[in-house]
Amino acid sequence: MKYDSNGALLATSIPGLPEPHRGKVRDIYDLGDSLLFVATDRISAFDCVMPNGIPDKGKVLTQMSLFWFELLSWMPNHLLCWDAAQFPASLKAVAGDLAGRSLIVKKARTIPLECIVRGYLIGSGWKDYRKNGRVCGIPLPAGYQQAQKLEEPLFTPSTKADSGHDENIS
């Protein structure tokens, strides 16, 4: 495991397993019939991974996911196990590092989609608006200021890129 000077987990390495697929924030290990998702403390903003992390950010992301899995428990999903104490024996040596930030999930076909709901005109939305008065192809009234609250939330899905830029879907 690789931690920064503030104790943020930046990268994982699990003895006996091949190197993971590394996304911008998560490391994904192939366990055969399932996958291990590890939410690191890496920070990704504007399609860039920052050199330092935020300690326990991965734990917060995982707890948010578990909240939604519980709220929508009536709907079938891919979650198999979230409790590191119940993970396979091959993961016991790193159970302390994985606790609270890891999920074992069913393998499934990935749909590379990011669902974004925008409440404020900031970031790439502001950049688009300044250029053409639209956000992801959605026209907005003139006169908005940077970081201003939008009258109604905007749903602006994009493709999900492992590296490089996500592309807006219009």
Sequence positions of predicted segments:
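Active-site loop/lid in soluble adenylation, ligation, and acyl-transfer enzymes
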Residues: 2-161
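A structural motif
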Residues: 158-170
